[in-house]
Structures are given as C-alpha cells and as structure tokens.
Amino acid sequence: MYSMSELKTNVGNVTLKNPILLASGTCGVAAREFEPYFNLSELGGVVTKSLSIKPRDGNPTPRVVEIPGCGMLNSIGLQNPGIESFVKNELPYLVEKNATIIINIVGEIMDDYVNAVDFIKARNEITAIELNLSCPNVSGGLDFSQDPKKAFSLVSEIKKITGIPIWAKLSPNVTNITDIVKACVDAGSDGVSLINTVLGLAINRWTKKPTLPRATGGYSGPAIKPIALRMIWETHKKFPKIPIIGIGGIHTTDDAIEFLLCGASCVQIGTANFVNPKISIEIINGLKDYCEKNKLSSISELIGQAHDVSKTFVKV
C-alpha cells in the first residue's frame, strides 16, 4: 500500500503533506463550503480568499461569465471581509480543521500590503503568505506584477516585517515572466505562484457590449493550462532552485503531473472546484496510483523531470 508520506513535497522550507492545494478565490473565504465533501486536513494546503487591510465590496455584478467548453471570466474585484475580520472569524475555523493555512494578501499600494501582513506577522498558525501581486480586475492590480522594480520593492518590504515564508503570485500578462520572478526572488521571496488569471473579454452579442461591467476580467480554466506550463517551464529552466507553486487549468491528475514535471513543487486547484468540489481529493488519489505504477519513492522525483529527456514514466 502506498504511504501518504511519499506524497510530501517541499516548497523551500515549507513541507506539505501532498502537493495539492485549494487556490485562492475558488473556495470561499476559508473553504467552509468544502466541509460536506472532505476534511481540509487531507489537502496539502488551503489558500484563503485574497485579504486586504480593509473590507472590500468588490465590483458591480455580473462578476462571472462562463466561456462554454473553455473556462470562465471573473471580475470579482477582490471582495473580502478584511484581514482583521478574517483573523477573528475564519482563522479559528481553519485551525480547528487542522488545515495547512496559506494567507493570500492583496493591496493597491505598498502600505496596504505592509499593513495587512503586519496584522498577521506573528501568527504561528500560518504556514505561508501568498502575495497577490497580479489581480487583473481592480484598478492598479497588475502594477506590482508587471514592473520588476515595484515587485522587488514590495517583496523586500514584506520580508522586513515577517519571518513567515512568502510566495509571490504573478501575472501571465507580461512579456518575460522570468524578469519578474528574478526580482521577487532577489527580494527574498521563498517561492513564486504561477500563474494568476489571463486578462480576457467577453461580448454580449444582444446588448453589443462587454458582458462584464468593467469590460475585462480574469480568464481561468482548462484553456490557460498551456500558458501556465510554458511559464513554469521557462522559470524552472532558468532558475531550477526556485520553488514554484503551479496554477492554471488543472482539472485532472494528468494535469497536476504535467505541472510537477515542468518544475512545480506543488499545484493549486481553482476553477475545477466549481465543477467538482471533490476534485482535489480525486487528484491526490490519482497521484498515489501514479507513484505506485512508476515505483516512485517520493512524488518529488517528478519535479522538473520534463527537462531531463532521459527519463520516462508510465501513464496512469
């Protein structure tokens, strides 16, 4: 029988029981909605909703548009209760459920991020902080993720105030992802989350206007997987020692394996949760089967192996 211990993976100094996490923004504020389906402790981790220093109401509705067969556009606008309310009302729930907790932090200016992180900097319940530098559906939401100097400055300031590991979540809407990655890592980021949603647009042919009130939104789902894989591939090839958290279009065990092979140390499941709330557990079980068939002593043996043409593996 395959041991769960062999599914352990390291993201820098962070050890996760398995490489499957719930992605921010796809599991409510603190994943309470998943309680009927599985125990949060079974996952590698839970990434919270993006949290800001003050509560946010989000964008006008409609906020979500389904793109049939391809995915969805969202323009939520980072609606959230604020970091103080989260710590008071939601963090105890995640602790009670023995979840591995990754707090996603967002802001519009540097002080927003600094103040939010300052509020949680000493919380030993938190495994890592994911800095959302790349939300495409709020004003200024891409600035930090598209400018290496701004990214460096922000991550540097955050590293000054907390010893909690920092993951920088980056945008695919850039010319060269490795420039932004280098800036974040040079500033002290302990890992990079690749990728956030792709900027997209949907048109209502009846109103002859964009479907979303803000016109554009963040595109997610199966269609963005090749973009995510390419950026993870480029990052791992140039910086093989930088821990990567893979995100983007993962809906199956095969998808997760491809991300690991490209260089990700773990992956986050996002849009697939809306289709099948049990998908994360199904992928974890699929990874066990894959490791058994390939006689792997550790899931970490897969990480980056697509860059080594001498190795082949058995299909699940």
In which residue ranges do the predicted regions lie?
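Catalytic cores of alpha/beta
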Residues: A31-P36, Y113-R123, V174-A187, K237-F239, ...
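C-terminal helical cap(s) of enzyme catalytic domains, especially alpha/beta-barrels
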Residues: N59-G69, I203-G217, L260, A272-S297
